[in-house]
Amino acid sequence: QVNELADLQPAANQVAIQVRAAGVNPADWYVVNGFFQLPPALPATPGFEAAGEILSVGAGVEGFAVGDRVLAVLPYLNDGTATFGAFAEQVVVPSSHILGIPANMEFVTAAAIPVMYGTAHIALTRRAQLQPGETLLVTGASGTTGSAAVQIGKRLGARVIATASGSEKVARVQQLGADV
C-alpha cells in the first residue's frame, strides 16, 4: 500500500532528508516478508539506508546544513519499535546517523554504503575486536559485505586472506587490498 504523508519536520538533533536513492539489502526483504527479528509496528515503511539532500535541520544540529548531500542509516531501536523508512520520498533521522558525501559520488552508490560497511565494521571491531597484525579470513570476499570487510580489515592493519570464485572476482578482491 502506498500512502501520502505530510512533509516531515525534524526535532532537536535531527535532519529531514529528501531521499534520492535507497539501498536494498536482505534485511529489507526480511522486514517486508515478516521475518525480521523485531517486526516494526504497522503501518511501516521499509528501508534501512538512503542518500539524498538535507531539507531542514533541527535545533542543535552541527556540521550539516540545508542542501548538504548525505547518506543515512535509519535507526533500528531494539526496544520493540522500529524506524526504517528509506523507501519514502523523505526521512527524518538523528544527525548522528548521517555522513556527508562528495559531490562526485552518485546517490545510488552512497545509498548502498551504510548497511554493507556498517555490518562489516561492527563485525570486525565490536564482535571480533580485530587488532593490527592479526589474520582475517573473509569468505565471499567479492560480495558487498565481504568487499567491505576486506577494506576495513586492511585499514585496521590485519593480514587479509580472502576467498572468491573465479579469476575476475579474485582480481577484484586483490585490488581491494586482500593479501592472499
What are the residue ranges of the model-derived segments?
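A local structural motif
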Residues: 1-4, 158
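Cytochrome P450 core scaffold surrounding the K-helix E-X-X-R motif
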Residues: 27-33
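Residue-level signal for nonpolar/aromatic packing positions in well-ordered secondary structure
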Residues: 52-54, 67, 101, 120, ...
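Short, conserved catalytic or interaction motifs in soluble domains
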Residues: 59, 103, 165
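NAD(P)H dinucleotide-binding glycine-rich loop of Rossmann-like/cofactor-binding domains
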Residues: 63, 73-140
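Mid-domain Rossmann-like dinucleotide-binding core that forms the NAD(H)/NADP(H) cofactor-binding site
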Residues: 111-180
